[in-house]
């Protein structure tokens, strides 16, 4: 699920309805919302943002992507609540002083275990490195991208040329009544 925010140059409700209808034809859309004051269209779903923009640029060449992100924003309130419940240090008891001393004594064995685990991790990382070497994708140069955008925005209406026959040259045009 993605949340896509697009900026459109719409002027009236008719253009708004046309934009909503155009976007709604794409598969994978859960909800569509339009903010006419800010001229922003919000699309939520699994649809590809590039497809949405290319579909809208046929009618509105100045369509731009403002934001592409997750559909639901992370909830900060839930994260803050556990901190408040366990907030602060627990009350000190008489039995805690020996535990802290025990921790100091037990730190040396933990460091040795970490070194052993660290050695295993390094070996694991060495094994993972040859497998995880994706080939870098080279993006096209910016000037080519601008030309492609200009070409897609230019959508001329094709006119059909008809041959106009002369009546004088057509033998079937002569009729005797």
UniProtKB/Swiss-Prot annotation:
This is Heavy metal-associated isoprenylated plant protein 39. Residues 72-129 have a biased composition (Basic and acidic residues). It comes from the Eukaryota. Probable heavy-metal-binding protein. SUPFAM superfamilies: HMA, heavy metal-associated domain. One of its GO terms (molecular function) is metal ion binding. Induction: Up-regulated by cadmium. PANTHER family: COPPER TRANSPORT PROTEIN FAMILY-RELATED, HEAVY METAL-ASSOCIATED ISOPRENYLATED PLANT PROTEIN 39. The modification Cysteine methyl ester is found at residue 174. Residues 1-68 form the HMA domain. A lipid is attached at residue 174 (S-farnesyl cysteine). Residues 175-177 form a propeptide. It comes from Arabidopsis thaliana (Mouse-ear cress). Belongs to the HIPP family. Residues 70-143 are annotated as: Disordered. Pfam families: HMA (PF00403). Keywords: Lipoprotein, Metal-binding, Methylation, Prenylation.
